[in-house]
UniProtKB/Swiss-Prot annotation:
Localisation per UniProt entry: Plastid, Chloroplast
Subunit text: Part of the 30S ribosomal subunit.
Gene3D superfamilies: 1.10.287.1480
Recorded GO CC terms: chloroplast; small ribosomal subunit
Protein name, as recorded: Small ribosomal subunit protein uS14c
Single Gene Ontology BP annotation: translation
InterPro entries documented for this protein: Ribosomal_uS14 (IPR001209), Ribosomal_uS14_bac/plastid (IPR023036)
Molecular function (Gene Ontology), one example: structural constituent of ribosome
UniProt feature coiled coil, ranges: none
Amino acid sequence: MAKKCWIQREKKRQKLEQKYRLIRRSSKKEIREVTSLSEKWEIQRKLQSSPRNSAPTRLRRRCFSTGRPRATYRDFGLSRHILLKMFRAGLLPGATRSSW
């Protein structure tokens, strides 16, 4: 189980990312369209003034139940440990064991 403060920190980052998403996208689009170097620098300065945690690259996908940051399956939002436990208990509909 991950520390609660880490999970809260990740939630805070998600909120910041959602808040600044349109601003960051529009700024990046402007940078691509503008040809003047001085204007690009000005837009880049504006982009850098946004909070560091608002960047989408700082987000980490975590397990929904345990908060584990690694080995998390996107389709389920669960880590491999919990996924296997749920699979063995028959809680995942449509999941079957492979045999070849």
